[in-house]
């Protein structure tokens, strides 16, 4: 099924892109062939249909080799083939995915090399369906075609990004057929289709059999055939926020903006969440609202299956609350008086202490404040200057 493509060594990740199937196509898999120990019988005669539909083929002259790019694969020498008693290419909507490596310099004019050849159309001279290297004309050399009888042919090299697939290198081709509608072909990339056109002349389907590798010189790693058009979505490869740290006052709002990459991502929707909505709420558009003092993380997550996320830390403050500190006054009798006060009161105490040391001000300082040891009681506390040994100030960060 389509999720097996990665395990087959097929990589449709273009630079800055990542792709996932638009849906689960496993139920549309008609036939699947892999030229390795899982897909070939121990006697090297039967090519198994791993889809479970029983479209097995009989191999003749096919060599199984280890290739540096393809791994375990089949080599066809021009006379080898795999023969089937069935038509493995279905009628109607279809996708055929082939991973191959074609030897260079093996073609000559007037020669066909078939990756797949499926029977002759009713009395027609050309096969009803074929995927072939076609060198009928000099301009066709080194090209791979997707053909239906005498209709228009879909060739890989018609796109400037594909110069030559007969270059002794690994390639993956995707041929889509939309049941007499627009047909798209891809090669090694899903960023842009290689070519697109409407087939003419209809679609032939006869009782003739199918052959893999007829007259072909080169390697085949795998073939997958579907009775639906396999399409892909571009999913995000990265995301960012316009800010990663923010500070708000209670009641204040701000807008976080998420940027999803690349620009052509199919689904750019995101999900916003707050680690504590009672402190900072966030709506579906990234608007945040500060509700009470505290710190939270606001997270944005892509909704296309890539599950990429970014976080902004938001601190909420209340400007009506002054800076706080703990004033520790050590008395000559060893007692330590602690006062949880604002910095304005600390500064007033320090000013009084300095002036009293110079001989002015009252001989005592009055605190009308809540004491740390008894936070629920308002105290009127008097500190006598001559009884003070020392004092310290501890700032509170929150």
UniProtKB/Swiss-Prot annotation:
Residues 240-306 form the BIG2 domain. InterPro entries: Big_2, ConA-like_dom_sf, Invasin/intimin_cell_adhesion. Pfam families: Big_2. This is Uncharacterized protein CA_C0552.
């Amino acid at each position: 099924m389509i999720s097996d493509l990665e395990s087959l060594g097929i990589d449709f990740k273009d630079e800055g892109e990542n792709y996932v199937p638009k849906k689960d196509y496993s139920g549309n898999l008609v036939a699947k062939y892999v030229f390795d120990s899982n897909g070939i019988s121990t006697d090297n005669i039967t090519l198994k249909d791993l889809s479970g539909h029983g479209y097995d083929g009989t191999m003749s002259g096919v060599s199984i080799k280890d290739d540096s790019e393809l791994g375990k694969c089949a080599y066809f020498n021009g006379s080898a083939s795999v023969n089937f008693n069935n038509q493995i290419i279905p009628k109607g909507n279809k996708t055929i995915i082939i991973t191959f490596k074609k030897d260079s310099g093996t073609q000559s004019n007037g020669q066909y090399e078939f990756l797949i050849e499926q029977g002759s159309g009713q009395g027609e001279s050309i096969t009803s369906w074929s995927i072939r290297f076609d060198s009928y004309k000099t301009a066709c050399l080194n090209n791979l075609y997707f053909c239906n009888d005498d209709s228009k042919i879909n060739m890989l090299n018609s796109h400037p990004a594909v110069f030559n697939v007969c270059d002794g290198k690994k390639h993956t081709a995707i041929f889509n057929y939309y049941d007499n509608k627009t047909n798209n072909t891809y090669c090694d990339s899903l960023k842009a289709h290689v070519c697109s056109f409407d087939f003419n002349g209809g679609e032939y389907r006869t009782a003739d059999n199918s052959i893999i590798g007829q007259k072909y010189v080169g390697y085949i790693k795998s073939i997958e055939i579907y009775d639906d058009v396999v399409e892909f979505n571009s999913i995000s490869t990265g995301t960012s926020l316009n800010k990663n740290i923010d500070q708000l006052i209670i009641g204040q709002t701000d807008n976080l903006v998420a940027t999803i990459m690349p620009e052509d991502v199919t689904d750019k929707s995101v999900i916003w969440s707050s680690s504590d909505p009672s402190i900072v709420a966030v709506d579906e558009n990234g608007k945040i609202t500060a509700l009470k003092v505290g710190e939270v993380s606001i997270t944005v997550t892509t909704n296309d299956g890539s599950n990429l996320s970014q976080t902004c830390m938001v601190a909420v403050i209340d400007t009506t609350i002054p800076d706080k500190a703990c004033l520790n006054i050590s008395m000559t009798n060893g007692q330590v008086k602690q006062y949880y006060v604002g910095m304005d009161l600390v500064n007033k105490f320090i000013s009084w202490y300095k002036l009293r040391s110079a001989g002015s001000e009252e001989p005592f300082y009055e605190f009308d404040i809540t004491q740390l040891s008894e936070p629920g009681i308002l105290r009127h506390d008097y500190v006598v200057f001559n009884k003070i040994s020392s004092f310290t100030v501890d700032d509170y960060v929150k």
